[in-house]
Amino acid sequence: ETMPSFKHSLILSSLKDSYILGFDHWYKRYYSFYHPHDECLKEHMSTRAIEILKHIYGEGKFSTNYDLHLPVDVEDKIKEFIGDTRIVIINPLGAKKICRLTFEQIKVIYQEVKTHFENYRIIFTGLPQDLLTIPILEIETLPFDEFIYTVALTKYSDFVISVDTALVHIAAAYHKPTLAFYPNSRTPEYPSHLIWSPNHHKSIQIVSPTYTVKDIDTETLTNSVKRLSCIDKK
């Protein structure tokens, strides 16, 4: 759903590879082979990986499971940070405006988590400057700035609540029970909430009735947190 970019064109035209497989119709002329998979896409984006593997190896069964590498020192720091505590991650403010919960919604989710996840440690993740704006006293955040530490925290967490699809898919890589809030798609021709859905059986996906997550009502928020608490709770 991105518009063509001259800068992107320059990057593609400067590639020295002898063969380029591409999916974006805006840049057809820069590819050795254009694949129409993404045209009128109505299924999860992971199916694109299958098409790439088919193109290279021919027909067959392929795994599209996520595989994330973590540096040992990063994992060690996170394990020391969390100790033997049980963790619920809340990621309430995404990079896009349409993926940012209101402060009232954040408070509702936070209170519900405290109610249904007693004795769990609640850690907020996101951009440091965004987390500073949340009007909840003494919320806990990571003491590390690099995103790789959030990835490691996700690996060692117990539950994840997120508006950020990147974190949703990281949680899926580690098979973490996840509550994911999505804006509705702007057009039926590109059902983004389906294409970029959690793609994991331990995930609960809540799709807003509008193009922004701020319109998800309080009852839906509270019920969804309650549902999350029933998944693999220790």
Where are these regions (language model features)?
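Catalytic machinery of carbohydrate-active enzymes
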Residues: E1-K234
